[in-house]
Amino acid sequence: MNDYKLDLEKYATLARQAAAEGCVLLENEKQALPLREGESVAVFGRMAFHYYKSGLGSGGLVNTRYVVGILDALKECKEIQLDEKLLGIYANWIKENPYDEGQGWGRVPWSQKEMEVTEEMLDCARSNDVSLVIIGRTAGEDQDNNTNLGSYCLTETEEDLICRVCEVSKCTVVVLNVGNIIDMSWVEKYHPQAVLYAWQGGQEGGNGVADVLTGKVCACGKLTDRIAADIKDYPSTENFGDPFKNYYKEDIYVGYRYFETFAKDKVLYPFGYGLSYTTFETRAEILKNTGDEITVSVTVSNTGEVRGKEVVQVYVKVPQGKLGNPARKLIGFAKTKELAPGEQEEVCIVIQKYDMASYDDSGVTGHKSCYVLEEGTYEIFAGSDVRSAKSAGIYEEELRVIEQLQEAYAPIEKFRRMKAVLRADGTYQAVTEEVPVRTADPHKRREERMPKTLEYTGDKGYKLADVLDKKVSMDEFVAQISEADLIAMFRGEGMCSPKVTAGTAAAFGG
């Protein structure tokens, strides 16, 4: 086998771009960001010194050659001046309060102890042009978030830090180095000028964040979750956390599908939302409509003063019919190229009608276990988020089956699930209906469909290439392999192979 060396510089460049373009700008009052050349910046928060590159669990046990944190990257930015006095205060405190690594799998703290803010630190906030507050969170496999302080919610020390810095600073920017959304009620309380979700950007994450903060990259990330005012506003909260069963009462009304249908007023930031350093104008129309797909044309114009990219999002409003549906469903999206001020681009998004179909698990449409398009008017919307997307056109459909399937794992216990009913005024009422319970035995069906057992033949000298050349069948090739070897190929060396990172499942041959 020829030696192959990865072009790490190329991959690092791509990772840096992904980290930057994934950052989501939620607030940017009076264009606080990007940071301007020559501005002095006071960096607050111990997580400036300890960047979360990833979450926990198997996905977090990744060996990287290096990790660039946010502070590491900011120190390389010659355009701004960092307050070295404040950094020294934090560095001395961290010596006495080292990073808590936790106690191994499933026992790593969601957040780190934060330094109590002092008057000396607040003087730094007063004397600099910008105060940058960095908050960090981690979570992951075997260690989901909870509603405790320091997980979904800020700790008292973190909230006090944001509160007091916002009170005295000319401009406060909060950067969230997190793997998922957290409670955001503090934004309305303390009104920081800018809020940036930086997520966990991998080994080049710090560079990506710094590129956005300094304007080398125009903010263009969008929320993949909507952010509600309170954790209790999410309908899944009621039944979360049962280790034995899950009553999926919200049914298809998950995330933005619930809030856009029933609770728009409880949303702080809608699905798909994200600000830019420039502005865009979009015009959309249905370009083509065939039996199985539609093509939506969206013209995006950069109406601002800096170069930037926009994410075009396409949604559909389908008939309520007999099944009930959310007010809008995401069916397509695309990102533009980087557009100069005054430049425009036409983006064409092809959408399969399969993605607009509804699943009938009860047979109420006359087509049980089918994806169907119900009869009625379908309206397409396009824009920069679910809330602001505007109509691109409407068309009619007759009732038709898109795909015939079979019942698999329907619920085994009766309960009531959520359903939307359209009122005369165009709003939606949340009602409930009995969930269809299981009528087929999936275990029995699998047993009936099991292939015949191959009789072990021993080594016949057949190679896999012989199968490719159609000299023998795959069954004849596999029949040569012993049961023990087949098991080893299927499960590898388990979770404890010395040849790979501990915890890696199904390692095979290192």
Describe every region a protein language model picked out.
Residues 1-510:
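C-terminal non-catalytic regions of proteins with extracellular/luminal or membrane-system context
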